[in-house]
Amino acid sequence: MKILLANPRGFCAGVDRAITIVKNALHKFGAPVYVRHEVVHNKYVVDELKAMGAIFVDELDEIPDGNTVIFSAHGVPKRVREEARKRGLQVFDATCPLVTKVHMEVHRASRKGQEVVLIGHKGHPEVEGTLGQYDENGTGMYLVEDANQVDSLPVQQPEKVSFVTQTTLSVDETRDIIDALREHFPAIQGPRKDDICYATQNRQDAVRALAPQVDVMLVVGSKNSSNSNRLRELAERLGTRAYLLDDASQLQDEWFTNVNSVGVTAGASAPEVLVQSVIDRLYQLGGSKLEQMDGVIEDTVFEVPVELRV
């Protein structure tokens, strides 16, 4: 059974930065360091940081006064920043800079009195953070999850509306919604540069190239990872049986009955050690040849805050 590895895969610059912020804060200040929400959506990473002394909370009221808090890579609503400021918490912001870019787009649009449509998945932390950037004196911001919802959007000023997208969606699913928005609101304005992040795009392109070449596609990533789910869905849309798994322990022997080739990739929040564990298990299940696919070389680096550089 041939094993083909997608490239690029795994950690992106935003995830790497967020994890480094937590680790460096623990090194500088000692445990505990509080983190609002999972800093990235990966069980292995979160468990590792917990073991080092990080405490993950849902809201700031779970954090005692005088402590350090880190905002996750997904970003937070303005009200959370204001609450932290009022309480005097020491804040380090691990929001991915590409998410911050979307936040600024929403902020600018609301200040201009524009209504804003956010393309994203309800309940995802990034979506909640982005919705929370809209000024209260603005006219309105709306979440849309599929093209069928566009006709029922309660937009009041169709000549003054813009759209933004969650950064971890697939290009395919946003394309249909954007087309519907442009048809329904001809004057709608979009971002100057696509909001889908470079790492999400690169990993999807790698799966798009690899999936048709294999019998089974494995995506290493956690169930609550948006970009990992999109990779699995993309492979399935291309006609390849695909599975999302946290680690090698979730591999099932029957997946590989009469399988001659298997593709492996990883979501942007999944560490390479988990990919390697999957490869090791595939060898035990009959894997005999490992091949690295060609792909985009990523050299983007996002700096951590000055106070946490070591």
UniProtKB/Swiss-Prot annotation:
Bound cofactor: record note: Binds 1 [4Fe-4S] cluster per subunit.
Keywords: 4Fe-4S, Iron, Iron-sulfur, Isoprene biosynthesis, Metal-binding, Oxidoreductase
Positions annotated to bind [4Fe-4S] cluster: C12, C96, C197
Reactions accelerated catalytically: isopentenyl diphosphate + 2 oxidized [2Fe-2S]-[ferredoxin] + H2O = (2E)-4-hydroxy-3-methylbut-2-enyl diphosphate + 2 reduced [2Fe-2S]-[ferredoxin] + 2 H(+); dimethylallyl diphosphate + 2 oxidized [2Fe-2S]-[ferredoxin] + H2O = (2E)-4-hydroxy-3-methylbut-2-enyl diphosphate + 2 reduced [2Fe-2S]-[ferredoxin] + 2 H(+)
Residues that, per the record, bind isopentenyl diphosphate: H41, H74, H124, S225, S226, N227, S269
UniProt entry tagged with the keyword Iron: yes
Gene Ontology MF term list: 4 iron, 4 sulfur cluster binding; 4-hydroxy-3-methylbut-2-enyl diphosphate reductase activity; metal ion binding
Annotated (2E)-4-hydroxy-3-methylbut-2-enyl diphosphate binding sites: H41, H74, H124, T167, S225, S226, N227, S269
GO biological process, one term: terpenoid biosynthetic process
InterPro entries from the UniProt entry: LytB/IspH (IPR003451)
Pathway it works in: Isoprenoid biosynthesis; dimethylallyl diphosphate biosynthesis; dimethylallyl diphosphate from (2E)-4-hydroxy-3-methylbutenyl diphosphate: step 1/1; Isoprenoid biosynthesis; isopentenyl diphosphate biosynthesis via DXP pathway; isopentenyl diphosphate from 1-deoxy-D-xylulose 5-phosphate: step 6/6
Active-site residues, as the UniProt record annotates them: E126 (proton donor)
EC number: 1.17.7.4
Residues involved in dimethylallyl diphosphate binding: H41, H74, H124, S225, S226, N227, S269
Essential cofactor(s): [4Fe-4S] cluster
A Pfam family hit: LYTB
4Fe-4S among keywords: yes
Protein purpose: Catalyzes the conversion of 1-hydroxy-2-methyl-2-(E)-butenyl 4-diphosphate (HMBPP) into a mixture of isopentenyl diphosphate (IPP) and dimethylallyl diphosphate (DMAPP). Acts in the terminal step of the DOXP/MEP pathway for isoprenoid precursor biosynthesis.
Database matches in NCBIfam families: ispH_lytB, PRK01045.1-2, PRK01045.1-4
Family affiliation: Belongs to the IspH family.
The protein's name in its UniProt record: 4-hydroxy-3-methylbut-2-enyl diphosphate reductase
